[in-house]
Every structure is written in C-alpha cells, then in structure tokens.
Amino acid sequence: MSKFDDFMKLMNQYMSYHGFSFEICSDMRLTSYSGESKVSLVDSDVRVMDMDVFAKKAYRKIILPDSLSEADSINTADAFLINKCDEWYFVEFKDAKMSNAKTGVLKKAYSNVYAVMDVLYAMKEKNIEYPPFDYGNPIQFFRTHVIYILVFRGALNPHHAMQLKNHRLKHEHYLPEFMKRLE
C-alpha cells in the first residue's frame, strides 16, 4: 500500500468515526475541472484527495455540527496527494486572474495545514496514527514535507505565464511574489 493509500485510509477512518462516508478520492482531471470554462486545467488520472469534498461534506459537519451551509466550510486547496518519498502536495487550481486570488490562496494554505493536523491528532487520540508524520514537531514536518502548487490558466495570467516560461528556461522554479510568504 502506498503512503497516499495509508493516508486515505486514515481520513476515511476519521470520517467513519464521525458517521460520514463520502468518496473523497478523485483524480487530477476531475478535481481541476472548471464548471465555468468547461475544461480541466490538468489532464491526468493521478489519484488525489478532493479537499473540497472533504471540507464541505464531512469536516465542516464534524467541527460545526449545527452548520447548514457549505459556506461555513474552511477554505481548502482543491487536491491533496502524497508521493512515494512522503512529500505532501496541496494543489490549488485557479481558472481566474491571480490578482483576484492572492489572499484566498494564502488562507487556503493555512487552512489545509490546520485541517490535516486536526485530523491527525484526533486520530492519534484513538491510537490510529500516520507513521511518517512527526507528531512531536509538526511545524518542522510541514516545512520539510509540504509543497503548495498553484496551477493557473496562462491565458488569464499572461504576466505569470511569461515568468513561469522564463524560469523554466533557466531550470528554476517560479514562485509568485505573494506565495513567498508560504516558504
């Protein structure tokens, strides 16, 4: 079983313990689909956790049992996955101009960390742990193992698309200025 499968098992146990059973596993193609433009920003069948489904259908109701509106949900990235080297990826898909998304992207980054830590520690209290996670130093674990990826539509963000292209030519990663606060 992969590390991602182990993590998904823990997430499903968490939901089950609270009386929820939703399919939170998806793929990049479905998770990156924009209903507005009717396209997927990523054409891949890589398995991911659909963070929006988890946040809106289960986590919101667990932490806010009286909530009747999905608007009460925490803001999360769209997708989450773990590779074989135990690097965690939160992926945000933006089919909009980035100037409209800067604050939301940063809030989502912190909300993701909070929600995942909340689940990990809640399950630890039930003697169910995700062994690769460092429960003794979670902040260091997140700094070392978590990567936040922002996928955007180049046509709507020509400046960022050009910067990305220039950085690729130099074999460098492109990090928009507003995301440097996440380093």
Where are these regions (language model features)?
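Acidic-basic catalytic patches of nuclease active cores, encompassing PD-(D/E)XK
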Residues: 1-70
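Polar/charged alpha-helical tracts
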Residues: 6-13, 122-125, 162, 180
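Beta-rich catalytic cores
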Residues: 75
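Conserved catalytic cores of phosphodiester-cleaving nucleases, focusing on short active-site segments
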Residues: 79-81, 87-95, 112
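Catalytic cores of nucleic-acid endonucleases
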Residues: 96-158
